[in-house]
Regions:
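Short beta-strand/loop segment that forms part of the nucleotide-sugar
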Residues: 30-38, 59-62
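Catalytic-site signature of metal-activated, phosphate-bearing donor transferases
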Residues: 72-78, 103-185
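N-proximal low-complexity "stem/linker" segments adjacent to membrane-targeting elements
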Residues: 1-23
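Acidic/polar residues in short coil/turn loops that connect beta-strands
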Residues: 41-42
Length: 185
C-alpha cells in the first residue's frame, strides 16, 4: 500500500503563489490541507479549485485577542499539530504557501521519496533551506521558480529545517517555531 502524505499548508494573502504551490504538491502525490489565516485576497477562491482533487479542506484559521483578529504563529503551529493527530495519513509536512518541496531523488516524486525514507526506518526528514527573493512583480504567466531568481544566504543556524514527520501523537512544532519538528526519543 502507498504511503499517504499530507502537507498542512498555511497561507495569508498568497493569491500570487497558492495555485502553483498546491498544484506542485498534488502532482507529487501529496495531499494538502490548507489553513487560511484570514486572507483578504483571492487565496481561498483559487485554492478551492483543488477541493476533492488533492486538496482535502480549506479551513479558516484566525485567532482573536480582546475581540480583534491577531496573527498567532504559535496557535497556528498547535493547530497543525492537532491536525496531524486527527487526519488519517502516514506522514505530514509543515509547509507555507511560498515554499516548494521536491524529493532529492530525481527519479522519485516527493511522496515516493518520503516512502523510501519510511522504508529505511526514519521518522523525520530534514530539508536544506534556500531563500529566493522576489525582486520584481511576478507576472501571471511566470512560475514561482521563474519569478524568484535572486538567492540570499540563509543564517547558519537556519539552513536545515525538519518539517516532515511520521504520524505521531507527540509531535512538537512549537518549541522551535516550526523550523524543527520534534518527536520524543
Amino acid at each position: 500500500m502507498k504511503t499517504r502524505v499530507c502537507a498542512i499548508m498555511s497561507a495569508y494573502n498568497e493569491a500570487d503563489v497558492i495555485h502553483e504551490s498546491i498544484q506542485k504538491l498534488i502532482q507529487q502525490e501529496v495531499d494538502v490541507y490548507l489553513l487560511d489565516n484570514g486572507s483578504t485576497d483571492e487565496t481561498v477562491e483559487i485554492a478551492n479549485q483543488f477541493l476533492n482533487k488533492g486538496l482535502i479542506k480549506v479551513e479558516r484559521c484566525v485567532f482573536t485577542e480582546n475581540g480583534k483578529e491577531v496573527y498567532d504563529w504559535t496557535a497556528l503551529l498547535k493547530r497543525k499539530e492537532e491536525l496531524s493527530r486527527q487526519l488519517d495519513y502516514d506522514w505530514f509536512m509543515h509547509v507555507d504557501a511560498d515554499e516548494i518541496r521536491y524529493s532529492p531523488w530525481a527519479h522519485r516524486n516527493l511522496r515516493e521519496g518520503i516512502e523510501l525514507v519510511d522504508q529505511m526506518g526514519f521518522n523525520l526528514i530534514n530539508f536544506r533551506l534556500f531563500n529566493f527573493r522576489l525582486t520584481h512583480e511576478k507576472s501571471a504567466d511566470q512560475s514561482i521558480e521563474e519569478a524568484f531568481t535572486h538567492y540570499s544566504a540563509v543564517e547558519q543556524f537556519n539552513r536545515m529545517q525538519v518539517k516532515v514527520w511520521k504520524k505521531s501523537s507527540d509531535i512538537d512544532l512549537v518549541s522551535h517555531a516550526g523550523h524543527l519538528a520534534l518527536l520524543p526519543q
